[in-house]
Amino acid sequence: KEHMSELYASKYLSLYKDFTARESKALLMDDSIFFNPFDFSLIVNIDSQIVEKKMDLVETFNTLKGIEVEGIKLRYFEDKKYIFVDGKNEVVIWREFDKESLDIAKELDFIKENCDITKELYINGITQTHTKKELVAKESIFELRALLVEGVKIDE
């Protein structure tokens, strides 16, 4: 499992490792690019060609984190798409969100109805919308950044 995560990270990250450290750091620090994780792309270097490549954040996170996926379900809340990834020991929630229009209390109820919150939770944008008292969850974007940076030496 760990070997596959390392192999995937190495292959995937090699697509953009030639970009400058400043650009890589900026990419990893801008939370707004993850507000719609279902329409995410990167400008990458493939065979000396600069191209835009769609990135599946759900699959990338599952693979890099080594999540043993037991099920995936798609739900909609207030016309926004949510994907719940049910892992053996964790639940990962990916969602489109706009914190200005989100009813946080209703979303919290929706999340509790759709997953086992006794498992370890990862949610994109959790720090933007919920307090730690409302829902104990890890910010998936911070975790994804850590996994990506682990595989690429962006300070070189």
Residue ranges and their predicted role:
Residues 1-156:
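Accessory, often C-terminal, charged low-complexity segments
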